[in-house]
Amino acid sequence: MKISSSIFPIISIFILLSISSVTPSDSDDSDDFDDFFQCLPKQSDSSIPITDAILTPNNSSFQYIYQLRANNLRTFLSATSRPVAIITARHPSHAQAAVICAKRHDFQLRIRSGGHDYEGLSYTSDVPFVILDMFNLNSIDIDMSTETAWVQAGATTGELYYRIAEKSNVHGFPSGVCTTLGIGGHFSGGGYGFLIRKYGLSIDNVIDAQLIDANGRILNRKSMGEDVFWAIRGGGTTSFGIILSWRIKLVRVPPRVTVFTVQRTLEQGATELAYRWQQVAPKLPKDLFIRLQPEPINNGGNNKTVRVSFIGHFLGQADGLLRLMNVSFPELGLTRNDCLQMSWVESTLYWAGFSNGSSIDVLLDRVAVNKVFAKEKSDYYKAVIPKQGLETLWQVLMDIENIFVQMNPYGGRMEEISDLETAFAHRAGNLFKVLYGIQWSESEGGVNATARYVELSRRLYNAMAPYASSNPREAFINYRDLDIGSNESDETDFEDAKEYGAKYFRNNFIRLADVKAKIDPKNFFKNEQSIPPLPSH
């Protein structure tokens, strides 16, 4: 996500939390609590003691680790409890033990890789729970002879890009723009980035996986079966088990690529260009991806306008890009001076918002430093937004101010893959996907500010309803949004799940529920937007 720090205040990672830890209040609870911790060493590899990986609220580093990989500070305001423990797994058996013992002693398990869940479901719950933190399981094993790699769940997108670049300057992988995303969760919801039109989603290039099921078994593609392998690619893995690692197929990229950013304000014809972009961007050759990103700006007093950025990535050199743009989108007026040529791995820095010339070593920074209060929502568009609709969008942006919108074109490879190929169903027929995000600072207040900004995000979402997909109004699971429907922390009502399930997974929801019934019939793996087992008839 490329966000200007001049627009949104930066706040410290450390904040004062008004939530309390869940500690046993009677003897029965205390027995369960103690039994859980005594269970863990018995179920894990003794050569790598799990006791060294367990943090409780009594540990001095507990609060630091809890917050370190919790990237949306808003979620703490609504949290009623902290976890009874954090298991910072250092060996696959630690994750297996967490499943077996949490299940045996009736603790809910939340799985966290990078901590980028927009609603914080990977590290909050309203019932006694344990966080299984996968961050230390971050190995990346690349085999250039087969152009494949095994990537553990705790590795970040930045680490993956860096390790590929160590081996080759003509290989890459299609996944997120943000470089601190945990691979485990990012891939499980689909995983997309600026290679989406050329190579599809991350999951479209996954060829195997290791999954821990509700019985603590480690399964691969063959042993889990094709139905489960289908479900974990785009269906949100934490409904089905715990991803240990993904096996991916690397993709080919040229030695040099070209990136650009062209900005136009409303006074410079941005509305006409945005209208034209909708018609052009989804139909461009696969090698070219152009994101449209409008943001409100204030030139002083009441002199507000909207500046629209056209951010492009081309798998080729500048001369070829200019020839293509002169034919397909001459209205943008792209010039040679707008273009920057660089290696593919350097282009990942460009998209992440690092300054030109930054060392690729920044890709190894695994934790997002600047935390924010935020609320995000998503939409899919199957028809061009009329100019009147764009003007509505501009007006709401100027009214709200602290908000950003990203419009990402589809077409290309996404048109070619069936919506039944994986659990990810948003394929052909979509022109673009949109992220709406609003952010605010700690200085603006706590609960009251949160309520106000969340309501503003809903105002924008409602304003765009006439133009977005409908029946259902589709949403992207990696842009988690509890507004579209949810369950309680410890319950998964099927009728409630159908509401958000249809929006996230369209017609694939029922098949996902059927798979859930087979691999996790007692619904051990659950959260507020998980997939329930399909009821038996």
Predicted regions and their residues:
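Soluble FAD-dependent oxygen oxidases
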Residues: K2-H537
